[in-house]
Amino acid sequence: VGKDGEGFELKCGLVDVGARTDAMIESGEVFTPTYMKPLVKEGNGRFSEMSRLDIKNRKPMPRDIEDELIDRLKVLLAGVDGVAVSDQVQERNCGVITDRVRDEIAGLAGEGKFVLVDSRVRIGEFRRAAVKPNSFEAARAVGLGFDGEPTLEQAKSAGVALAEKVGSTVFVTVGAQGMVVCDGGGAVHVPGRMVEGEIDIVGAGDSSLAGIMAARCSGLDLVDSAAMGNLVASVTVTKIGETGTASPDELRAVCD
């Protein structure tokens, strides 16, 4: 993170939920990438969103920070069950997941740890790690053309092709239809949970990644882990005007 207000707020938020921050790198050479959606309260008490405000780095990650990131990843690996990678910075090499770091992630995945990746524009460049694209990202990564939103069958085809490309499992999210789990041998559709009422899908992909990660590290198989990802996302999308979270009690409640 940068030595800025956004980095400070992020660290405070992590501490508040009990997350460790001792391995985080703080540097005055970078900004903390931040995506903000200002809200305006209407007369009826409802909130409406204004245009998004983004804070980004416009120059490549310094080499010394890359070196430290890679060193810390290697040290931390021994004490964790899995690694979740969120590569949301679109500008190449301007975020934490640079080309060098991505190569190191492939090595980590080859050491038997469960590594799960979500990447906004480079999902097809990862190797050995499991990846979690949506249907558009999966199709784009393997060069499959389509008109409009990909169908479930197109998502399956894209997922299988992407699994062969990255050399690992692919979890393709397909909106309200749930998820497709793919490997080189085929695809399994894991239906989503039906949700009624108003929803906000922003962050649903992050929620499903967290659900898959928690389930897989707890020993569930790939299909059951995908089902957990669907379940978590089905809860978080119902949180309007707030950060989408899904507690164990909330997950148990929707399963009753």
Describe each PLM feature range.
Residues 194-212:
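Short glycine/threonine-rich catalytic loop with a Thr-x-Gly-x-Asp
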